[in-house]
Regions:
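The feature marks helicase ATPase cores and/or their adjacent C-terminal helical subdomains
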Residues: 1-330
Length: 330
């Protein structure tokens, strides 16, 4: 892609690479599942059957949110532009309380692990704060009862197969004092006000999402899903990699796979920058494409969503990036 030839190690295992080209309007979940199935057929590697055994590289975090099912939580915070770093890192306080305290408590409670429930409460609940507990020597039974009652009230939100919103969970722990939630939670839980801070509005909208979206978001930001960004895996390698090229969903302007594959023409800015020897969206995209594709140790599937499948195919062949038998139109 960048006119540099890469020399494989003499002892390297021969890998498999495939380019799957599909219309940008196709169902992405279906396409990517079908691609994984086709990789099993072409490689004989059943690791492609298990979503946990291959890495899917996407351009932007919101593409993972839509695929992994936490868009309702993620998009209001992303669109507000007020939480960029903390959203990526998983360090927004209201979300951290839910992911680091409530989620482990829920797992322990629902699995009947009373020891772990007690451990989480003793370590994190102000109701059983060491200082409070010691000064309340004559009232320790009451403190324990209050903590147990707070846990039961929280867990009732999941009774009868119900799924509470993140707001409902926050309200419960604030009202009972089970965990310390911070002053901003009061504003988030209050009714909307026209003169309120934009952050509060975005948080309230995001936290109206069902709690399972918080669980999925927490898994994603802790790198416990198959998704990662093209930029975020530099220097890392994985046995099986699916690189997803989807300009329409990415919404950015710095990179363009449609330009790289000849579907869209260069912009005037691209042409001027190329003439001046500066970076263009094509050179930036070529470098990013190289980084993403070289993350695979055994097999690589590239899924290109496009408005012109034939052009992508012809460009890939004309440039010698892929052989004819390595390309599928899905």
């Amino acid at each position: 892609v960048d006119d540099q030839k890469q020399q494989a190690r003499s002892d390297a295992e021969e890998g498999t690479v495939r380019l799957f080209i599909t219309s940008k309007s196709n169902n992405k979940e279906y396409v990517e599942k079908r691609v994984a199935e086709m990789m099993v057929q072409d490689t004989g590697d059943i690791g492609w059957n298990d979503e946990e055994d291959y890495k899917s590289l996407i351009l932007e975090h919101h593409m993972a949110a839509s695929r992994f099912g936490f868009s309702e939580l993620y998009m209001p915070l992303s669109n507000s532009k007020k939480f960029d770093t903390s959203l990526r890192e998983g360090s927004i306080p209201e979300l951290s309380i839910l992911s680091k305290l409530v989620f482990p408590l829920l797992v322990a409670y629902q699995s009947g692990n009373d020891f772990e429930v007690a451990k989480i409460i003793r370590k994190n609940s102000p109701l059983l704060n060491k200082e409070v507990f010691i000064t309340g020597l004559n009232n320790q039974v009451e403190l324990l009862r209050k903590a147990e009652e707070a846990v039961e009230l929280l867990m009732k939100l999941w009774n009868d197969g119900k799924v509470p919103t993140c707001l409902e969970v926050l309200k419960s722990i604030r009202d009972t004092g089970l965990f310390k939630v911070g002053n901003r939670v009061d504003e988030v839980l209050a009714d909307y006000s026209q003169d309120e801070n934009e952050k509060i509005t975005a948080l309230r909208t995001a936290l109206s999402a069902p709690f399972y979206e918080l669980e999925r978001y927490a898994l994603y930001v802790s790198d416990n899903t198959r998704f990662a960004t093209h930029q975020g895996v530099k220097g890392l390698e994985f046995p099986r990699v699916m690189v997803i090229l989807d300009d329409a969903q990415a919404r950015g302007f710095l990179f363009s796979y449609e330009k790289l594959f000849g579907v869209k023409a260069q912009s005037d800015t691209d042409e001027k920058n190329a003439h001046d020897g500066k970076d263009t969206s094509i050179t930036r995209t070529a470098r990013l494409f190289y980084v993403a594709c070289t993350r695979a140790k055994k097999s690589l599937a590239i899924v290109a969503y496009t408005e012109n499948e034939e052009m992508v195919r012809d460009t890939a062949l004309a440039n010698g990036w892929f052989l004819e038998n390595e390309i599928y139109i899905v």
